[in-house]
UniProtKB/Swiss-Prot annotation:
ZnF segments: C3H1-type: 12-40, 148-175
Protein name: Splicing factor U2af small subunit B
Gene: U2AF35B
Record region (Disordered): 184-304
Compartment list: Nucleus
Length: 304
């Protein structure tokens, strides 16, 4: 009996545990799901929920003012964000995988999955990010059950053939350019899919269970097969965090518009028109940006 339960754990045959949360670390029903979400108390992978804010959050390809956004500027905006996150998290250890979801569903939009080489590194990052802010928004950090991203990513999206668009329940991983990849990862190969660390048979079943799981996807999207609860679910409403501005200032080193707001030395937000694509070699280094952020934090904490 125990062997049977272990063999079906995390699959559609498991009527107790949610297979979507187990494989993807997110479920559209959230806490209202009829199956259990077994949240790990420790993991080599952390998720920063809804952290990446696309410039076209309301309508794809259009900014908040209804103006079309240059795809180059959108990619530039994303790569600025990616570089910021990678450099900050690299302080805690070697980042093996950093995936940013390009999905549009509430429970997956902007999710950032970070897998470290060692579990202790993930714990250090998890603890350090508690109560911090990024770009004026609290950071929501949790341990994620995902350790093998091959089972979590959408193959059809990678082949440009996913007909579910941004509302697919598998990860649509947004890609960075080759230049930034070489800069961040150097000669080592970026393991974008991660790796399974558990010796349990449930991690060795391979593509058979993944294909069975995918065949059940349409029933899940329709709310059938034992799933209950409304859409949306998990993640964007209940922000938690500290009282002061910490770790923020990101998301807008080169871009423009409302998403690219800067913070001056007094912590006040100032708006500017979108600058042109920066091609000048004069650009702040990561150390200079971090020094400014630390200065802002100290000044805000010293204020009565």
């Amino acid at each position: 009996m125990a062997e049977h339960l272990a063999s079906i754990f995390g699959t559609e045959k498991d009527r107790v545990n949610c297979p979507f949360y187990f494989k993807i670390g997110a479920c559209r029903h959230g806490d209202r799901c009829s199956r259990l979400h077994n949240r790990p108390t420790v993991s080599p992978t952390i998720v920063l929920a809804n952290m990446y804010q696309r410039p076209d959050m309301i309508t794809p390809g259009v900014d908040a003012q209804g103006q079309p956004i240059d795809p180059e500027k959108m990619q530039e905006h994303f790569e600025d964000f990616y570089e910021d996150i990678y450099e900050e998290l690299s302080k805690f250890g070697e980042v093996e995988t950093l995936n940013v979801c390009d999905n549009l569903a509430d429970h997956m939009i902007g999710n950032v999955y970070v897998q470290f080489r060692e579990e202790e590194q993930a714990v250090a990052a998890h603890n350090a990010l508690q109560g911090r802010f990024y770009s004026g928004r609290p950071i929501i950090v949790e341990y994620s059950p995902v350790t093998d991203f091959r089972e979590a990513t959408c193959r059809q999206f990678e082949e440009n053939s996913c007909n579910r668009g941004g509302y697919c329940n598998f990860m649509h991983v947004k890609q960075i350019g080759r230049e930034l990849r070489r800069k961040l990862y150097g000669g080592r190969s970026r393991r974008s899919h991660g790796r399974s660390r558990s010796p349990s048979p449930r991690h060795r079943r391979g593509n058979r269970d993944r294909d069975d799981f995918r065949r059940e996807r349409d029933g899940y999207r329709g709310g059938g097969d034992g799933y209950r609860g409304g859409g949306g679910g998990g993640g964007g409403d209940g922000y938690r965090g500290g009282d002061s501005y910490r770790g923020g200032g990101g998301g807008g080193r080169r871009g423009g518009g409302s998403r690219y707001d800067r913070y001056d030395d007094g912590g006040r937000r100032r708006h500017g028109s979108p600058p042109r694509r920066a091609r000048s070699p004069v650009r702040e280094s990561s150390e200079e940006r971090r020094a400014k952020i630390e200065q802002w934090n100290r000044e805000r904490e010293e204020k009565p």
